[in-house]
Amino acid sequence: GTACSCGNSKGIYWFYRPSCPTDRGYTGSCRYFLGTCCTPAD
């Protein structure tokens, strides 16, 4: 995935997903990408 930093956390983008996977934390919505930013960033 692509690295992202939304809010106070860093993570990776999950494109075209309305929400993060259950084992991932939600950092925030980045308007300039079609996806959500989820942690951890691996």
Curated annotation (Swiss-Prot):
Classification via Gene3D superfamilies: Anthopleurin-A
Phenotype upon changing R31A: 2.1-fold decrease in ability to inhibit rASIC3
Site (Interacts with ASIC3): R31, Y32
Annotated phenotype, changing N8A: 1.2-fold increase in ability to inhibit rASIC3 and decrease in ability to inhibit hKv11.1/KCNH2/ERG1
UniProt GO MF annotations: ion channel inhibitor activity; potassium channel regulator activity; sodium channel regulator activity; toxin activity
Effect seen on changing F33A: Complete loss of ability to inhibit rASIC3 and hKv11.1/KCNH2/ERG1 (tail current only)
SUPFAM superfamilies reported in the protein's UniProt record: Defensin-like (SSF57392)
Outcome after substituting A3P: 4.1-fold decrease in ability to inhibit rASIC3 and no change in ability to inhibit hKv11.1/KCNH2/ERG1
Keywords attached to this entry: Disulfide bond, Ion channel impairing toxin, Nematocyst, Neurotoxin, Pharmaceutical, Potassium channel impairing toxin, Proton-gated sodium channel impairing toxin, Secreted, Toxin, Voltage-gated potassium channel impairing toxin, Voltage-gated sodium channel impairing toxin
Site, Important in ability to inhibit ASIC3: residue positions: G1, T2, F15, Y16, R17
Variant or mutagenesis effect after changing L34A: Complete loss of ability to inhibit rASIC3 and hKv11.1/KCNH2/ERG1
Result after altering S5A: 2.5-fold decrease in ability to inhibit rASIC3
Outcome reported for the amino acid change (mutating R17A): 44-fold decrease in ability to inhibit rASIC3 and mASIC3
Effect seen on changing R24 to A/Q: About 25-fold decrease in ability to inhibit rASIC3
Phenotype for Y16 to A/F: Complete loss of ability to inhibit rASIC3
Site entry: Probably important in ability to inhibit ASIC3: R24
Cystine bridges: C4-C37, C6-C30, C20-C38
Site note Important in ability to inhibit Kv11.1/KCNH2/ERG1, residues: N8, P18
Main localization, broad class: secreted
Function summary: This toxin potently blocks acid-sensing ion channel ASIC3 homotrimers and heterotrimers containing ASIC3 (composed with isoforms of ASIC1 and ASIC2). It also weakly inhibits potassium channels, and sodium channels. On homomeric ASIC3, this protein shows IC(50)=57-87 nM on rat, 37.3 nM on mouse and 175 nM on human channels. The blockade is rapid and reversible. On heterotrimeric forms, the toxin is less potent (IC(50)=117 nM on rat ASIC2b-ASIC3 channel, 900 nM on rat ASIC1b-ASIC3, and 2 uM on rat ASIC1a-ASIC3).
Record-stated family: Belongs to the sea anemone type 3 (BDS) potassium channel toxin family.
Protein name according to UniProt: Pi-actitoxin-Ael2b
Originating species: Anthopleura elegantissima
